[in-house]
């Protein structure tokens, strides 16, 4: 193969790879951005040693994505304090870099995050942090959804969960359940699902903490 041919092949590969990277970047949805940031926050804190550089990068990603508060009504399970647990919020994650005692005032950060942004904004990712006791199940109701919604959950470090999801139409009262596979029933650190309906509906999410310790969980909706 001549040098000229090799050069042409190299140029073609360069533009092909660049094009693929551009397509991938363009297809990253706001939901995926927030979902992945929550996962990376846990990765940065895994093993008990926080990576300051990673945490700052995650904090910036969440700040730029600007998720708004997710309106959630807890209908089953104990309502626990977030004290001592991870809050999936850019200010809390940034504070983790320099302040090891930040977990003691986790509830304060969670409350402030729920006041940030306009809850009525359309086409925005919604995010909240919830607690589930070890081995217990909490059920949450997310109202006023329409069309196709993407829902995700990310457990804090060293936690796993299973979940059940169903939608209930406001007008027809019809229910649709989204089945979990075996791996989900045994417990996973994160999970996502798409749900849809031809009418306005609410989403019922039941999260079972499969861990032996209480845990915080990010609930994400888009």
PLM region descriptions:
Residues 105-121, 201-222:
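C-terminal edge strands of extracellular/lumenal beta-sandwich accessory domains
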Residues 44-54, 67-74:
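Charged, low-complexity interaction regions
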Residues 1-8:
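Positively charged n-region of N-terminal signal peptides that target proteins for export
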Residues 9-19:
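Bacterial N-terminal signal peptides
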Residues 32, 130-214:
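Acidic, Ser/Thr/Pro-rich low-complexity intrinsically disordered segments
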Residues 64-141:
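Non-catalytic extracellular/lumenal accessory regions of secreted precursors
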């Amino acid at each position: 193969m001549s040098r000229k041919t090799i050069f042409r092949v190299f140029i073609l590969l360069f533009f092909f790879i660049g094009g693929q990277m551009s397509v991938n970047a363009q297809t990253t949805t706001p939901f995926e951005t927030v979902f992945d940031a929550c996962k990376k926050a846990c990765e940065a804190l895994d093993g008990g040693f926080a990576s300051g550089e990673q945490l700052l990068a995650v904090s910036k990603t969440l700040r730029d994505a600007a998720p708004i508060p997710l309106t959630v009504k807890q209908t089953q399970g104990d309502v626990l304090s977030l004290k001592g647990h991870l809050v999936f919020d850019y200010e809390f994650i940034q504070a983790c870099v320099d302040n090891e005692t930040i977990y003691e005032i986790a509830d304060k950060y969670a409350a402030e995050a729920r006041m940030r942004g306009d809850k009525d904004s359309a086409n925005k990712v919604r995010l909240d942090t919830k607690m589930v006791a070890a081995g217990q199940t909490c059920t949450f109701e997310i109202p006023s959804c329409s069309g196709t919604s993407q829902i995700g959950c990310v457990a804090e470090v060293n936690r796993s969960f299973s979940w059940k999801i169903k939608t209930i139409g406001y007008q027809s009262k019809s229910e649709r359940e989204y089945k979990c596979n075996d791996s989900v029933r045994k417990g996973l650190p994160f999970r996502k699902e798409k749900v849809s309906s031809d009418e306005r509906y609410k989403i019922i999410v039941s999260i079972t903490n499969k861990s032996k310790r209480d845990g915080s969980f990010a609930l994400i909706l888009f």
